[in-house]
Amino acid sequence: MKTILIAFISIAFINSTIILTENKKGEINGYFYELWYEDYNGKVKMSINENNFTCSWKNIDYVDFQYGKNIEPSKTLDELGNVTINYEAQINAEGDIMFGINGWAYMYESFNIIEYYNDEFVPPGTSLGTLFIDDGEYEIYYDEKPVQLNIHGINKAIIFSSVRKEKRLKGTINFNKHFQSWKKKGCKFEYISRLSLLIDGNKSKGNAIVNQIAINYKQK
């Protein structure tokens, strides 16, 4: 009887949908998920299944939905091999929103590959020129932001971004080509510690369906 009960509980967990309505993070089948937002007077919801999720938000100053992979320990691009991200989504939103890939290299070092955005979107930093990847033209941006460490000092966060000019909600991203292009523009990032698909809203409202997420790299 005990064996049957344990099997039943396991199946129920696998087939269930994880629903978030407050700041929270967790893991499902090797991927992490995270919901973070400001202004608790608004409403947010994130419903997560394996390799897909839906989300909605309104009356929120800032919201961040993520689904991706933590790479522990951090690895170089040579160690990861050919890194690709396959995705497909539908977004219906008003205001400043962006959709794409977010990642961390090391503490205070991050990067974005932005595939879709609304008219209110503000480019992230100073333009370093353009490049052609994945049958599309991207503009590269560099930005620095102060980070208050403690009362004794301030560090700076360094961010490199690729912003696709012809927006899309379905495709395959060749991460290596973006990373190598940032290097040519002065990027000194050495390690990759996190890769995620990101929906980011700033003073906006909307909903989204992410039908597919697959982050592929060599795992040892």
Language model segments and positions:
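Cleavable N-terminal signal peptides of Sec/SRP-targeted secreted and luminal proteins
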Residues: 2-16
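Short, flexible beta-strand-to-coil junctions
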Residues: 14, 88-95, 104-107, 165, ...
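Beta-strand-rich luminal/extracellular ectodomains of secretory-pathway glycoproteins
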Residues: 17-80, 86
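A structural detector for beta-sheet-dominated domains
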Residues: 21, 36-38, 45-49, 56-60, ...
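Beta-sandwich interaction modules
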Residues: 68-76, 144-189
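Long, compositionally biased interface segments
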Residues: 169-220
